[in-house]
């Protein structure tokens, strides 16, 4: 399901979904290597914009926008988890290296799935209930401190 991380080769095209402060710090380090860095972000004045080799203004949660941006990259990564996972899955199936893997992003984006993953893999986490209905709230209300 999840591939091992492969090296990013010199001359590669690296795309980043999200152009905030973390992306800016990433670019400031990555710029020392022979990679072409592109950023997709909805804000024209995103912190990454002045540092990237190319900047595309657009929505990173829109399938068509992410797909069009990603098909020109060798490697895609994220700066924010609120991205279109379906587009990343398609790009991965077409040979684009996507990190983190879209399957991992699905878990990270859904905090309920994330908590279930922790529990299934014995990763310490705070106690939790998955609440899907009013009845669930009524059933678990006595277990909450307030």
Protein language model regions, located:
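ATP-binding N-terminal substructure of ATP-dependent carboxylate-amine bond-forming enzymes
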Residues: 1-104, 108-109, 113, 135
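Active-site nucleotide/adenylate-binding loops and adjacent lid/helix of ATP-dependent enzymes
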Residues: 107-146
């Amino acid at each position: 399901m999840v591939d091992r991380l492969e090296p990013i080769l010199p001359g590669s095209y690296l795309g980043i979904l999200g152009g905030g402060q973390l992306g800016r710090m990433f670019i400031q380090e990555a710029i020392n290597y022979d990679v072409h860095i592109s950023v997709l972000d909805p804000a024209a004045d995103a912190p990454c914009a002045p540092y990237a080799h190319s900047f595309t203004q657009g929505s990173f949660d829109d399938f068509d926008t992410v797909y069009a941006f990603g098909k020109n990259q060798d490697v895609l990564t994220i700066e924010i988890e609120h991205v279109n996972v379906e587009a990343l899955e398609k790009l991965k199936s077409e040979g684009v290296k996507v990190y983190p893997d879209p399957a991992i992003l699905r878990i990270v984006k859904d905090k309920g799935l994330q908590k279930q993953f922790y529990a299934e893999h014995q990763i310490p986490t705070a106690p939790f209930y998955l609440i899907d209905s009013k009845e669930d709230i009524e059933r678990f209300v006595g277990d909450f401190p307030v």
